Every structure is written in structure tokens, then in C-alpha cells.
Amino acid sequence: MANSATITSKKGVKSHQKDWKIPLKVLILICIAVASVSSRLFSVIRYESIIHEFDPWFNFRASKILVEQGFYNFLNWFDERSWYPLGRVAGGTLYPGLMVTSGIIFKVLHLLRINVNIRDVCVLLAPAFSGITAIATYYLARELKSDACGLLAAAFMGIAPGYTSRSVAGSYDNEAIAITLLMSTFALWIKAVKSGSSFWGACTGLLYFYMVTAWGGYVFITNMIPLHVFVLLLMGRYTSKLYIAYTTYYVIGTLASMQVPFVGFQPVSTSEHMSALGVFGLLQLFAFYNYVKGLVSSKQFQILIRFALVCLVGLATVVLFALSSTGVIAPWTGRFYSLWDTNYAKIHIPIIASVSEHQPPTWSSLFFDLQFLIWLLPVGVYLCFKELRNEHVFIIIYSVLGTYFCGVMVRLVLTLTPCVCIAAAVAISTLLDTYMGPEVEEDKVSEEAASAKSKNKKGIFSILSFFTSGSKNIGIYSLLSRVLVISSTAYFLIMFVYHSSWVTSNAYSSPTVVLSTVLNDGSLMYIDDFREAYDWLRRNTPYDTKVMSWWDYGYQIAGMADRITLVDNNTWNNTHIATVGKAMSSPEEKAYPILRKHDVDYILIIYGGTLGYSSDDMNKFLWMIRISQGLWPDEIVERNFFTPNGEYRTDDAATPTMRESLLYKMSYHGAWKLFPPNQGYDRARNQKLPSKDPQLFTIEEAFTTVHHLVRLYKVKKPDTLGRDLKQVTLFEEGKRKKLRRPAKTNEIPLRV
């Protein structure tokens, strides 16, 4: 009676727990979402509401066109102010999801009589979506283990620096909403596979369509889900639920994605989409085989069917290779192919290799972005192997692919972070479950019930019951062990929170257009040279001014200065970029015809030698040389820019080719004026300034910012008398020297 009363009371406690667990989970999720949003607002508080980096400036400019001119004009937008004189079909060559999302939010807020600027919507979009990402991660992780695991994963995802780096306020890039859609699509996919519901499969397809509109990384989902299905088929786990989920997702998702202008017919004509199509066909064969298998019981017929299936799969593979070799199916693009052949971009497409985000990461950068979670990834994967349900197989595949791609390209730590957070949550929740339960009282009750049950059994049955009763919970009952493990885990979690907050605040919340440095007294000094230069361009040059710069700054010039650019961050035309690189690396007399041919009015360069800014153009110079050498190997030779010892020198030991190049002259022209005589120093390259000031003949300095970071040079017009500009410059300098010459005391002035 006592045992039954205890069990009844425990049931009452459990039912009471269910009543308060749901609102508690909702409250915790709200707190996680608020923490996710607030931790990304450092840049707005410390600086102001401003767009960061480079690509976001184009997205912001496109969003303004969308809300000002409407969706139809946005889709048909031809940008004549970029890639001069070619222009760019912007509306058909971008992923519109980010801009459409901002536009809808902007319109809804105005309908609600909330007057906001489109810039503020763009700045705060990424933090807002980070809260939704945490909730989506919760729903995905809870399918693996429990609600506690989901809450841990959501908390990790909300503040992990690997995700924060692309979702702080002002980071208005495609990834701002793409990771949210990635996790939401995966969560719905697992839901569809477990339920076998065509509704959830359709929802997965619609979210996949949203993802396609938002980010080129949708190809990761395109290949991830088919790979999951393929592995399940190899494991012999074909079910009608799997068939319904994938076919519904694939048909709706593919047809919807083909409505995006930039994607078009790629889902049925490019190599990176063929795995999804192949698995779709394979599922139809499996469905047909299982249908026939249920109708016919003959062994020989089943063998024949299996043979036919193998032949069909082999034939499909041969046809795929044949279509790929003939060009009917487009091959992998350079950016995707470089994920498999890591040296491909460096050898064949240096423009891809020149982007710092496309370099492989270091161990320190992985720890910087994921802290102790990276060590828990293999633990979580191991625990998934122990259960190995369909959803666990998905996370295992995700972990393997995410780790590989992150190891190839540091930018893809963004796609690795979600699975690391989930795997770490599985590991920690399992650890805490082991050391925080089961309760000792519960175990005593179960032992008493088992002993009472065994008393009723006699002889051999009592012995067998001892060996077969495997329902006893295994836990850690030592209080010291529990306290040590739980306290150490809590310590690591607290340190993770401190680390994430520090990294977000100090490393990822500084806009690229505004720099800051700490002075000797501990105060912050802000360096606003970029906006100073762009503001000067906007105020002091005509609207149709053509500005040449390296492609990194094209979007910023168009967004802040509103001037015409030759190249920008879209990098769709390698020849045009190589032409700019050739002009920068050629001697002045050879660069001038290129400048005149492209109607260049001003040249913008970044020189970091004064401040010690290492991301200036002289440190990017080798990439300009390599890209232009790919098209003009006889005119531009990289070896000529290195000393006989193989050193990259910019001081007096620099090679003649280096000293005569246009970029070198523009960078070091007048730089010695900021230092005492013979003490000039290049802080970015840790070398002395050249002792002889480079002289310019075809261009002249127009503006240099206060910290000597951004420099603008005006291209001279041809001489009206047809004289060589070098001779004209030397002649003018000679006249100035004559005018400055002091008059002799015994010299009699001429009478006029």
C-alpha cells in the first residue's frame, strides 16, 4: 500500500511538473532570443546606426531602390553606375530575399504608423533574425534528444561567435537571414521525415525556396538533404514516410526555386544540383521495387527486379557523365570546385583565392569562434552514433560535411557553427542527465518494487528475473562526484558566455568603414577616414565622375559617395578586374592610356603605412599582379616585383619594376612629409619609407584624409598643346623654382 501511495504521489508530481514546464520553456526561449538580439547591438551603441563592411553597402543600396521604386523596377534594375562602361544587370544577378524581407518589414511598420528609416531596418535585421535562429535550433535539437538539449543548443547558437560574426547590427549581408532559414529548413525536414506528412514536406520545400532567394549557399541544403536520404537508403531504412517527405520537398522546392531569376533552370542543368535529382529518381525506383515486391512473391522475379534496378542506376550514372562531358549539364563553378580541389582557385582563378574569407582557417580561429564547443563536437557525434535514429544520421552527416568545408574555407565556419552547437548540447545534456539523475529515492522505490516482485517468484524464475530485469536506472550517487562535475561544467559554460561576449564586442562589432584604436591613456580614438573620403567625393566631384579603385571598395564608393565605379565586389568580370590590376601595376606612362580609355577621373587607394593598417592596397598588390598576369603574362610578371632574394620590399631595396608601378608611386607620394627628415617609416610593412619621394606626372593628388589612410588622385587631361605630360610637369616645376629663386642684391630690375 505504501509503495502504491508513493507511486500515485509521484504521478501527481509529474503531472504538476508538466503544467509549469511549458511556460518555463517559453520564458527561457524568450530570454535566449532577447540575449541573442542584445548581444549584437554593441556596434550601434558604440558607434551609430551604420552599415558595415563591403557587400552590405550594395544590399542597402538595392533595398532603397526596392522601397522607392517598387518590386517590378527592382527586378528589372540595370545598374549603369557600376562596371563602367559595361554596367550590370543587377536585378537579374542577385538573390532578392534579403531586400524583399527588409522591404516587407519596412512597409508593415509604415502601415502600423511606425515611421522608420530603411537604413535602420537593414541595420537591425540581422540581430532580429538571430533570435529566430536560436528558436529554430531549439526545435531541431529537441528532435535529437530532449527539450533540455534543445534549450542548450539554442543558448549556444544565440551567442556563439561563429554565428555572431555575420549577424551583428549593421551586418546587412545575405547570411543575416540565411542561417535562420538553414536551421528552419533542417528542423522542418527532420519533422517531415519523422511524421511522413506531406504538409511538413511542403513546408520544407517552401522554406527551401525562401533560402534560394536569400543566399547562394542554398546549394548546401540542395546536397545535404539528398545525401541524408541516400545514406538512409544504404542503411536499408526506406519507408513510405521518407518517400513522401522527400518527393514533396523536392518537387515543390525545385519548382519554386526555378522562379528566382538568378537561378532559373540551374536545378536541372548544373552539376551541383544533380545529386538532388538523382536521389529523387532513386527513390522512385525504390518505391516501384517495394510495390512490386508486395505483389509478387517469386524469388526469381525479385532477383530480376534487383538486377534491373542496378542496371538503371548504372545507366543513369553513365548518362550523367556523358551529359556533363558534352556540356549539357554545366560543370561545377570555380567557387564550388575549389571546395573539392583546394589548389584549383590559387592556380586557375586567383580572384577567388585573393578573398581572405576563402582561405583555410587555423586552429586558433576555430577556437576563437567556437571556444570549448569545438571539443564537444566529436562527443556529440559519438552519442548520436549510439542511438542512430534517422535524425541522428542527419546530424552526423552534417557534422562531417560542415567540418570538411570549414577546413577548406574559413567563411564556412558559419555553416559549421549550428551543428557544433547541437552536438555540444547533446554532449552536455547527456552529462548533466547522468550526474543530476536519477534520484536516489526513485531508485530505492524501484528496488523495493523489484524485491517485492521477486518474492512472488520461486525457484528458477527468481534467478532468471535477476538477470532479465534491465530496467534499473544507472546514475552517479556520490555527492562529491556530482558537485565536481556539475560545477566544472557550469564554470566552462560561464567562461563560454564571457568569451562570446568579449569576441562579439571587440572583434565583430567594429564597422569596417570606421576604425578605432586604444590610446596610451586607455581612451578610444575613432578613425573615420573612409567616410571622410567618400563624403569629399560626393561634395566636390560631378555626379558622373568615374572612380577607379581595387574591387574591394566598389560597393562603398557607390553606396556612400554615389559615384560611378569601374569594378566592385560582384567580381563577375575577371577581365575588367585584371585591367584595373594592370593599370595599378604598370609604369605611369603605360597606365595612363588605360585610364584615359576607361574615362577615369579619380583613383582611390588605401595606404596604411602611416597608421599601421595592414589591409591596405600595397598588401593586396600581389593579387592585383597575379590576376592581371593571368591575362597579360608577357607584360606583367610577378617575379619582377620581388628582389633577387625573393623579398617583397617597398623601401630603397625595392625593384625598379616595383618603384615604377603606379600604385607604389601613389602610396608613397608625399608620405615622408609626416615624419622628421630620414625617419619615415611604413608601419604596415615594417620597412623604411623610400628616401626619394616618387614623382607623378599624369596624375595629381586631389585629397588625402586626416590620418593619411585614404588617398584620392585626379587623372590629368591631355595637354591642350599636345605635349607629353611628363615634360609639361617638369617644365612647370622648373618655372616654379625660377619664381621662388631669391633676387640678387646687385641685380638691376628691367624697366618695362
From Swiss-Prot:
Give its E.C. classification number. 2.4.99.18
Top-level enzyme category: transferase
Looking at the record's lineage, which domain of life comes first?
Answer: Eukaryota
What are the subcellular locations of this protein? Endoplasmic reticulum membrane
> Looking at the UniProt record for this protein, which Gene Ontology cellular component terms does it annotate, in alphabetical order?
endoplasmic reticulum; oligosaccharyltransferase complex
Which amino acids does the record list as binding Mn(2+)? 55, 173, 175
Tell me the keywords, alphabetical order: Endoplasmic reticulum, Glycoprotein, Glycosyltransferase, Magnesium, Manganese, Membrane, Metal-binding, Transferase, Transmembrane, Transmembrane helix
Q: Which Gene3D superfamilies match?
A: 3.40.50.12610
What residue spans carry the region label Interacts with target acceptor peptide in protein substrate?
Answer: 550-552
Q: Where, by residue number, does dolichyl diphosphooligosaccharide bind?
A: 411, 555
According to the record, the segments passing through the membrane are 22-42, 126-144, 147-164, 176-195, 198-212, 218-234, 240-265, 274-293, 303-323, 363-385, 392-408, 413-434, 483-503
The site annotation (Important for catalytic activity) covers: 166
Q: What is known of its domains?
A: Despite low primary sequence conservation between eukaryotic catalytic subunits and bacterial and archaeal single subunit OSTs (ssOST), structural comparison revealed several common motifs at spatially equivalent positions, like the DXD motif 1 on the external loop 1 and the DXD motif 2 on the external loop 2 involved in binding of the metal ion cofactor and the carboxamide group of the acceptor asparagine, the conserved Glu residue of the TIXE/SVSE motif on the external loop 5 involved in catalysis, as well as the WWDYG and the DK/MI motifs in the globular domain that define the binding pocket for the +2 Ser/Thr of the acceptor sequon.
- Return the similarity comment: Belongs to the STT3 family.
Could you tell me what this protein does?
A: Catalytic subunit of the oligosaccharyl transferase (OST) complex that catalyzes the initial transfer of a defined glycan (Glc(3)Man(9)GlcNAc(2) in eukaryotes) from the lipid carrier dolichol-pyrophosphate to an asparagine residue within an Asn-X-Ser/Thr consensus motif in nascent polypeptide chains, the first step in protein N-glycosylation. N-glycosylation occurs cotranslationally and the complex associates with the Sec61 complex at the channel-forming translocon complex that mediates protein translocation across the endoplasmic reticulum (ER).
| Name listed for the protein in its UniProt record | Dolichyl-diphosphooligosaccharide--protein glycosyltransferase subunit stt3
The protein's gene is named stt3
